A protein has these predicted regions:
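Short beta-strand->loop
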Residues: 56-66, 138-143, 150-164
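N-terminal winged-helix
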Residues: 1-16, 20-33, 96, 140-141, ...
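Hydrophobic hinge/microswitch elements
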Residues: 27-40, 45-46, 97-152
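Short secondary-structure boundary segments
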Residues: 47-48, 71, 142-144, 171
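Secondary-structure junction motif
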Residues: 3-5, 90-111, 175-179, 183
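A late-sequence structural motif
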Residues: 3-4, 153-187
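Mid-protein regulatory/catalytic core that forms ligand/cofactor-binding pockets
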Residues: 20-66
């Protein structure tokens, strides 16, 4: 919600005071299940390129993963970091039930190594707090770099790893309010 979506949502809510938008934080698999049960009108998550049949996913904006590390980390002096340079680093990440954990495994394995996960925590803010304490590093969407995290620096990876944000919905069930929201988010 910190990226480009925040100002768009702010404007949409101001211009459409009669539209009630409820936010429910859930992992992508839970959002998809709720969409299938018609408990949600739309879901928003990263890299939603293969939703369930019958659902549409539209990219809201392009984003990339960055490496977040303690400000005194030796790699912090670099402008960009190759993924392979993280081979011997300890990672702080979300738990294995979260898509970020699976993502981290896949990305690191594509660079020829398995990540050494030292801590798993529930919230991205806690991940970044642990990074600031020097416990480890993490890969995180670039929208987090828009906020100040004392003791943490964000560096791009030499390889672009997409963290694009998508909205997923059923076009056949889209209400006029949802269509208006999607138009605002996509434009």
């Amino acid at each position: 919600m910190w990226g480009k979506m925040r100002p768009v949502m702010r404007r949409f809510l101001k211009e459409n005071p009669n539209v009630e938008v409820l936010f429910r934080e859930n992992m992508p698999a839970m959002q998809m299940a709720m969409l299938e049960r018609r408990e949600l009108d739309a879901g928003v998550w990263r890299m939603a390129t293969a939703p369930s049949p019958g659902f549409t996913s539209l990219r809201l904006h392009e984003s990339s993963f960055l490496v977040a590390m303690p400000e005194e980390h030796p790699l912090a002096a670099r402008k960009a970091t190759p993924l392979a340079a993280l081979r011997n680093e300890y990672f702080v990440t979300m738990p294995s039930i979260h898509t970020d954990w699976t993502f981290l495994q896949r990305v690191c394995q594509s660079a020829g190594f398995s990540p050494m996960i030292i801590r798993e925590v529930m919230e991205p803010q806690t991940v970044l707090a642990m990074v600031s304490m020097g416990i480890g590093i993490t890969l995180i969407a670039d929208s987090y770099a828009q906020m100040t995290w004392p003791g943490v620096v964000f560096r791009p990876l030499e390889e672009r790893i997409p963290a694009d944000l998508y909205i997923v919905y059923d076009q056949q069930q889209a209400t006029p309010a949802l269509e208006k929201l999607i138009a605002a988010l996509v434009n």
